[in-house]
């Protein structure tokens, strides 16, 4: 009986160790985006950051409910204190279609104007586009 218990204990320990090792190498880091997606990182120095963030959150909620082109977006604050947004589009084409929609949508444009009143000139808004490989 002691021998069987010892073998079971060793077998259980071996399974546990192999599972812990497998867990150490699987699932710790998941991709932030997939191949072919476009990630946009917006940066806008903002005089009234709290108001800018509030308007940006409202804008993202509006986009989520109304954009005919699916993408994800999240508000953020850049390390230098600027207002930021990170958008992930499924493809270049999807991004282009979303931009056309934004340019034509009056409500979206009003959010942009409201952010400009909180943050300053739209000319100060910059964007970095990353194509995921």
What residue spans do the PLM features occupy?
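Non-heme di-metal
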Residues: 111-112
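Short S/T/G/P-rich N-terminal loop/turn motif that feeds into the first structured element of a domain
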Residues: 19-107, 117-133
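Bacterial N-terminal signal peptides
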Residues: 7-16
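Positively charged n-region of N-terminal signal peptides that target proteins for export
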Residues: 1-6
């Amino acid at each position: 009986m002691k021998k069987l218990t010892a073998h079971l204990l060793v077998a259980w320990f071996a399974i546990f160790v192999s599972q812990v090792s497998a867990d150490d190498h699987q699932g710790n880091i998941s991709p932030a985006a997939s191949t072919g997606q476009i990630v946009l990182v917006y940066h806008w120095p903002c005089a009234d950051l709290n108001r800018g963030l509030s308007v940006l959150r409202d804008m993202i909620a509006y986009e989520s409910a109304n954009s005919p082109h699916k993408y994800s977006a999240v508000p953020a604050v850049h390390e230098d204190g600027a207002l930021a947004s990170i958008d992930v589009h499924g493809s270049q084409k999807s991004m282009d279609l979303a931009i056309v929609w934004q340019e034509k949508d009056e409500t979206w444009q009003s959010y942009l104007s409201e952010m400009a009143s909180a943050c300053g000139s739209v000319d100060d808004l910059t964007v970095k586009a990353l194509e995921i490989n």
